[in-house]
C-alpha cells in the first residue's frame, strides 16, 4: 500500500527527535573552554560539565562562571578568583584551592575529598550536603558559610574562621577545629565525633541537640551557650570557659567570667 505524501511526512517528522538525540551534546561552551585555557580569564563563562582534570589553572579568573558538575579532579586552582562561581555537584577531589577566593560560591553537593583550601576565602559560600573528607581548611575564612547537612570527615580546620556558619545537622567526625573561631555558629543537631575543638571559640554558638562524643574541648570558650543533655559531655573538661552558660539542669553558670 502506498503512503500518501502527508503520511510519509508525518512519520518522518516523528523520527526527528530520535535522530537529534544521537548527536553528541556538550553542556559547556567549547569557545569558553578554549578561552579559559588560552587566556586564563573566563568570567561568566559556561563550563558546565567541563573536563578540567589535572589542569594547571592557578591564578585564573572565573568570576561568576558556571562550573556545575565539572570535573576538577587534581586541578591546580591556587590563588584563583572564583567569586560567585556555581560549582554545584562538581568533583573537586584532590583539587588545590590554596589561597583561592570562593566568596559567595555555590558548592552544593560537591565532592572535596583530599582537597587543599588552606587560606582560602569561602565567605558566604554554600556547601550544603557536600562530601568533604580528608580536606584542609587551615586558616581559611568560612564566615557565614552554609554547611548544613555536610559530611566533614577527617577535615583540618585549624585556626579557621567560621563565625555565623551554618552547620545544622552536619556530621563532623575526626575533625580538627583547634583554635577555630565558631562564634555564633549554628551547630544545632550537629554530630561531632572524636573531634578536636581545643582552644576553639564557641561564644554564643547554638548547641541545642549537638553531640560532642569523645571530643576534646579543653580550653574552648562556651560563653553565652546553652548546653542540653546531648552536650553535657563538655562539662569537666579542663580550662573550658563557662560564662553566662546555661547548663543541662537549666542553671546559669558564670564561674569563669572573670578570666
What are these regions (language model features)?
Residues 2-12:
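Bacterial N-terminal signal peptides that target proteins for export
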Residues 28-259:
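Tandem repeat scaffolds
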Amino acid at each position: 500500500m502506498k503512503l500518501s505524501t502527508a503520511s510519509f511526512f508525518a512519520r518522518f517528522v516523528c523520527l526527528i527527535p530520535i535522530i537529534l538525540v544521537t548527536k553528541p551534546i556538550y553542556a559547556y561552551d567549547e569557545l569558553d573552554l578554549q578561552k579559559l585555557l588560552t587566556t586564563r580569564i573566563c568570567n561568566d563563562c559556561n563550563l558546565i560539565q567541563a573536563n578540567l582534570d589535572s589542569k594547571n589553572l592557578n591564578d585564573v579568573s572565573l568570576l561568576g562562571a558556571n562550573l556545575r558538575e565539572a570535573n576538577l579532579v587534581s586541578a591546580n586552582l591556587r590563588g584563583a578568583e572564583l567569586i560567585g562561581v556555581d560549582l554545584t555537584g562538581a568533583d573537586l577531589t584532590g583539587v588545590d584551592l590554596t589561597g583561592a577566593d570562593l566568596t559567595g560560591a555555590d558548592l552544593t553537593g560537591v565532592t572535596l575529598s583530599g582537597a587543599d583550601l588552606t587560606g582560602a576565602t569561602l565567605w558566604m559560600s554554600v556547601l550544603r550536603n557536600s562530601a568533604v573528607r580528608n580536606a584542609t581548611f587551615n586558616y581559611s575564612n568560612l564566615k557565614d558559610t552554609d554547611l548544613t547537612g555536610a559530611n566533614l570527615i577527617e577535615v583540618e580546620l585549624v585556626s579557621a574562621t567560621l563565625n555565623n556558619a551554618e552547620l545544622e545537622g552536619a556530621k563532623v567526625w575526626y575533625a580538627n577545629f583547634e583554635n577555630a573561631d565558631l562564634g555564633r555558629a549554628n551547630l544545632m543537631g550537629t554530630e561531632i565525633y572524636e573531634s578536636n575543638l581545643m582552644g576553639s571559640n564557641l561564644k554564643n554558638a547554638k548547641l541545642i541537640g549537638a553531640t560532642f562524643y569523645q571530643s576534646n574541648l579543653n580550653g574552648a570558650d562556651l560563653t553565652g551557650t546553652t548546653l542540653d543533655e546531648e552536650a553535657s559531655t563538655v562539662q569537666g573538661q579542663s580550662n573550658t570557659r563557662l560564662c553566662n552558660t546555661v547548663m543541662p539542669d537549666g542553671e546559669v553558670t558564670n564561674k569563669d567570667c572573670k578570666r
